[in-house]
A protein has these predicted regions:
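Short, charged, amphipathic alpha-helical segments
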Residues: 3-8, 36-43
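Active/binding-pocket-proximal capping segment
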Residues: 23-32, 70, 74-77
Length: 162
């Protein structure tokens, strides 16, 4: 449902915040006293942000549905249709003009040329996400995980019944 979709977006936001905090906590001071956050953590965010952004757009499209297609222009509120628009678009949570602004923003982000350019920016400005992920893997410190697997396999071999 709606809450599940919005919950995925808020969970993605918390993952981003947590990763940024980790990058700050695992950073270091260089010889000039300049603090640099952990690049490995930041690369993890960079590799997932385009997908998170795309998902946010899809959720917005789904929730706004047909409302974004027929949204009036702001000038129409000054014309003969103002009363009808106010009655039709006002909800218990937003005035007609506020709802129109929100729906116009949703349309701009999900369906206009501006929104599509922003999507391309999210995917490629920071670098090719596939390349970033490959570099992230190549730079990952997997030693602790590999040692844990080795211990589990050794324990399994010791307990194997043949």
């Amino acid at each position: 449902g709606v809450q599940e979709k919005l919950g995925r977006l808020t969970a993605n936001l918390e993952l981003i915040k947590g990763t940024i905090t980790r990058s700050e906590d695992n950073g270091h001071l260089d010889e000039f006293g300049i603090y640099t956050p952990s690049l490995q953590a930041l690369q993890a965010v960079r590799s997932t942000l385009p997908e998170y952004y795309d998902e946010a757009l899809r959720v917005t499209q789904h929730l706004a549905a047909g409302s974004i297609v027929g949204v009036p222009s702001f000038a129409e509120f000054d014309g003969d249709n103002a009363t009808i628009l106010n009655q039709a678009l006002t909800t218990d949570r937003a005035t007609a003009k506020t709802r129109t602004r929100l729906l116009n923003l949703a349309f701009d982000l999900t369906s206009s040329g501006f929104g599509q350019r922003q999507l391309m920016y999210e995917y490629y400005h920071g670098g090719d996400p596939m390349r970033i992920r490959a570099q992230h893997y190549q730079r990952a410190d997997l030693q602790a995980g590999n040692q844990m697997i080795d211990r589990l396999l050794s324990a399994d071999n010791a307990n194997t019944h043949e």
